[in-house]
A protein has these predicted regions:
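Short, surface-exposed alpha-helical segments at coil->helix boundaries
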Residues: 33-34, 90, 280
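Active-site acidic catalytic loop and adjacent metal/ATP-binding pocket
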Residues: 58-65, 74, 106, 156, ...
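Helix-rich C-terminal or lid/interface subdomains of diverse kinases
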Residues: 147, 226-229, 269-356
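Short, surface-exposed acidic
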Residues: 45-52, 207-211, 291-299
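ATP-binding pocket architecture of kinase catalytic cores
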Residues: 50-190, 205
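Juxta-kinase regulatory segment immediately upstream of eukaryotic protein kinase catalytic domains
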Residues: 2-46
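Glycine-rich, phosphate-binding/catalytic loops in enzymes
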Residues: 91, 139-140, 251, 268-270, ...
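An alpha-helical support segment within catalytic cores of ATP-dependent transferases
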Residues: 27-47, 114, 141-147, 154-234, ...
């Protein structure tokens, strides 16, 4: 259970050094590849015709295999972390698939570690590239993708479930239903908040005065957290988790961070990465299905601020601020370094919320 986690990649118990080993593309070992190939063989009932590991960053291992006709995508964990959230991811994609939402089809999920040393999912292999490919190449049609994103998120947020926060794995496993593990949205929002603020202050990333202003904003706006019903949120709706063409979204992947909560939080995540004109078009598209008011727009900045805290923390301790210009996060619409951009987004959020 993710009972004491706000954002898994930032807050789970692995050491920083272990996270660095796990999150980067050179993490694949002979043992991890061998285990994955055994899973593929077990699934097919015979040796796969094709099998390759995909050199991707992130907290999972990714592989491609085929039986000579159908292609499959295999995703595993490291077998070390006590986390079974793949069950939630698979249940979410199954539910969304019933509504014809563009998500991968899942064929198998296992988290019991009985037969293999890792937890895993087997899904359809989608050959369409991520939108980050086009973003990095400067060929992305921002207006079209903003409209597509607004439509997708508005449809996603029509899916509502009891409680808040991460999906309760015990309930999902025992009762076969989706619900959150927190009784209130505020309980989830405040998880690890003191840790995030303390880290940023202790490492002199944010000043004591800035921390005080942030705490004041969260206290003053805490009534926004009093919501009665939560929507399904992706919580990492970024270009690398969206597949498609320069003009069109074809699938949304990686539901590892999905929670039940305030729809404005999902848009706050998007706002962490995108320019005002992108957000304006997205909101126009979003509001065609789910009308928004000025309070909703202010809440987007409220959640942008909350999410930029953990983002800045993980970017610092993972050494992202020291990566060269080729690092994918170093490209942004303000043409700033990643550290400058992170601090600018925090300052923008504070300034927007201070004028309310």
């Amino acid at each position: 259970m993710r009972s004491d986690i706000f954002y898994w990649k930032c807050d789970h118990a692995l050491s920083v050094e272990s996270k660095k080993e796990l999150y980067f593309a050179d993490k694949y070992s002979t043992d991890s590849i061998s285990a994955a190939k055994s899973i593929a063989q077990d699934f097919l009932g015979r040796e796969p015709v094709e099998f390759n590991h995909l050199k991707v960053d992130g907290n999972h291992f990714a592989y491609y295999f085929s039986d000579g006709g159908t292609k499959f995508f295999l995703r595993t964990d490291d077998g070390l972390s006590e986390d079974c959230y793949m069950l939630a991811e698979s249940a979410i994609m199954e539910e969304l698939g019933k509504s014809a939402m563009p998500v991968p089809k899942v064929f198998a999920t296992s988290v019991d570690l009985k037969r293999f040393p890792v937890r895993y999912q087997i899904m359809e292999f989608l050959e369409t590239p991520s939108l980050n490919t086009f973003y990095q190449q400067n060929t992305l049609n921002f207006r079209s993708i903003a409209r597509e994103s607004g439509m997708f998120l508005s449809r996603l947020h029509q899916h509502k479930y009891p409680n808040f926060g991460f999906i309760d794995i015990d309930v999902l496993s025992g009762e076969k239903r989706i619900c959150g593990s927190d009784r209130t949205w505020a309980a989830y929002f405040n998880k690890c908040l003191d840790k995030h603020l303390g880290y940023l202050q202790d490492n002199q990333i944010l000043s004591s005065e800035t921390i005080r202003r942030i705490e004041h904003i969260f206290e003053r706006c805490k009534a926004w957290l009093d919501i009665r019903e939560g929507s399904l949120l992706h919580r990492d709706f970024a270009y690398w988790n969206i597949l498609g063409t320069p003009e069109k979204l074809s699938a949304v992947i990686d539901w590892d961070d999905a929670v039940i909560g305030d729809p404005a939080d999902d848009l706050g995540i998007v706002n962490c990465f995108n320019a005002p004109d992108f957000m304006e078009i997205l909101l126009e598209s979003y509001s065609a299905i789910s009308p928004v008011d000025e309070t909703f727009k202010s809440k987007i900045w409220f959640y942008t601020l909350r999410n930029m805290l953990w983002k800045t923390m993980i970017r610092h301790y993972m050494g992202y601020f020291d990566r060269d210009k080729k690092f994918f996060l170093n490209k942004n619409h303000l043409n700033l370094s990643l550290k400058e951009y992170s601090l600018e987004k925090i300052n923008q959020s504070i300034n927007k919320l201070s004028t309310l």
